[in-house]
């Protein structure tokens, strides 16, 4: 097994999606369908095709078997019977059964806003009552793939009609609620079947983007020159009696969840650098002694992303250890990082493993037959069973949703620690770049992320234990797979918001860490050179030099430990601490060494020296502060993988370091009439969120993963192995 299976799977799916988008179409043959292909159809206008002669032959053979069975004495469900708990009825004319099935299923709620038709408005409706078009497109593609396996007795003509709907951008408007995913997703699929029938009361979206319009299915078929389809024996049931809606939306969910979880792993690296973490907890030995594959994979990814960082310490085998002379945190406090960082591999690892299993379950479902009864092409027999029960999808998406909550909890804990100056190893309160009494920068983000995590935790509760008996107690157990998938997609949206907020805060924290660390580095150097001139006459230079090393460290600690003070007060406190240690090293450490020299100053001389040092610090800090805000140097000090995510934020999106109150937008700071000017923090976080939603951030993560040597995961290697078990008819 690969040592990085989730990352390699994600890179493989990412490459596969790019490949399909450039190709523009996907051949459906009943097996080999992956979640990337579903996403390509749903989100990127990639059209499914069915042109394989063997597939067409399977469809023809399946319908011939059904026709022969109908002519015989065998009782076939849905052909000679009613449906569900009413299957004890025996209709005299089975030709109307398909229409009767559509009538009983097309019962979902849609409001006039969904349909763009005249009627009283419903301003109290907060959310649309219809499925997103992308879900419906994905559902159609998945149902086609399930049907072309040849077990549902669907005609080739019917499949071609479904394909034409997608190709001509006719997307049925499907109610969001009403499926219990027991006998498949009956209600959603019935609206797709109703579109094929040309129902004047089923509505569709024709076209995409600004050119899209809402018309009836009857009008839409007329516009593309397609006749309404008269469903053949059992075809109505064959179209609706499956798990396609659950499987399709679960495919989108697992793809997004895998990417968000990997992004959260990379984001933990940024937080570690912002917090100047002591990352010995990433040593391979720790994972080797507890060999859960997910834990080892997380640690390996993080080690690779942090390689070369001058903001963290403790990476094993550092070839550039001599570079780690930058003082990035106080040398007091906890000797180990708190659990949100130190145990992140142990926390994220099980989520990696669950996502791999969920992906496997969903991929199998995409390439399975879900219907009843089934046609056996080898024997010609009809088999009655329950392959429509979508519990495998429920199992998958509930694992995904639980994993999302766990990832969110980790990010929430990391973020609130990073923003809190009493826990973040020397960064200012709320990650404010100016005086903490004037600016509260990321405090609102802390509140937002708590809100997102609360909702995410609520959504993570199991759906499957809320099953209600339905349909004359015939469907007494039902999977609720589509319902669970809907809530999983909501959870993905929330975690995406959290990732966006934490990424914004982490970039700010890294900037501040570098700004203060480089200030101390340059200032203590100049201070050491200037100290002889600041001291009263009569002190030997040798004595001063012996005291300086300890005093400088005392100065650095005082600076980090007083991050909650405004700059003027911080400089004053730091100057006092420096002079105190210079005069008496025991003020800094109790185990005073013989070589430590105590400089004997009078009280007046001490006050004068403190004032001189304070003035030196104040001038140096304000000069350094202004220069850094003008041109941050953060990228020179961070790990290669972290740098990719940092630069994506700072350069690709153009989101600058927050300078404090000066960056709050107001009419006065518009550069020119009509310009946007400065942005709120929320606007910047929204830009990041949009980049997460449209895949740009993960694309950068994928590139960075390869740049740091984490494997290619190419479509010709990993993908073939990942799906080897499923690529059989």
Curated annotation (Swiss-Prot):
Segments traversing the membrane: none
Gene Ontology terms: cellular component: cytoplasm
Post-translational modification 2,3-didehydroalanine (Ser), affected residues: 183
Induction, as annotated: Expression is induced on squalestatin S1-producing YMG medium.
EC number: 4.3.1.24
Catalytic activity: L-phenylalanine = (E)-cinnamate + NH4(+)
GO biological process terms held by the UniProt record: cinnamic acid biosynthetic process; L-phenylalanine catabolic process
Covalent link 5-imidazolinone (Ala-Gly), residues: 182-184
Keyword annotations: Cytoplasm, Lyase, Phenylalanine catabolism, Phenylpropanoid metabolism
GO molecular function: phenylalanine ammonia-lyase activity
Location within or outside the cell: Cytoplasm
Principal location listed in the UniProt entry: cytoplasm
InterPro entries: Aromatic_Lyase (IPR001106), Fumarase/histidase_N (IPR024083), L-Aspartase-like (IPR008948), Phe/His_NH3-lyase_AS (IPR022313), Phe_NH3-lyase (IPR005922), Phe_NH3-lyase_shielding_dom_sf (IPR023144)
PTM annotation: Contains an active site 4-methylidene-imidazol-5-one (MIO), which is formed autocatalytically by cyclization and dehydration of residues Ala-Ser-Gly.
Active site: 77 (proton donor/acceptor)
Residues involved in (E)-cinnamate binding: 241, 336, 342, 372, 443, 471, 474
Top-rank taxon: Eukaryota
Pathway: Secondary metabolite biosynthesis; Phenylpropanoid metabolism; trans-cinnamate biosynthesis; trans-cinnamate from L-phenylalanine: step 1/1
Family: Belongs to the PAL/histidase family.
Function field: Phenylalanine ammonia-lyase; part of the gene cluster that mediates the biosynthesis of squalestatin S1 (SQS1, also known as zaragozic acid A), a heavily oxidized fungal polyketide that offers potent cholesterol lowering activity by targeting squalene synthase (SS). SQS1 is composed of a 2,8-dioxobicyclic[3.2.1]octane-3,4,5-tricarboxyclic acid core that is connected to two lipophilic polyketide arms.
Name of this protein: Phenylalanine ammonia-lyase
Origin species: Phoma sp. (strain ATCC 20986 / MF5453)
Gene: M7
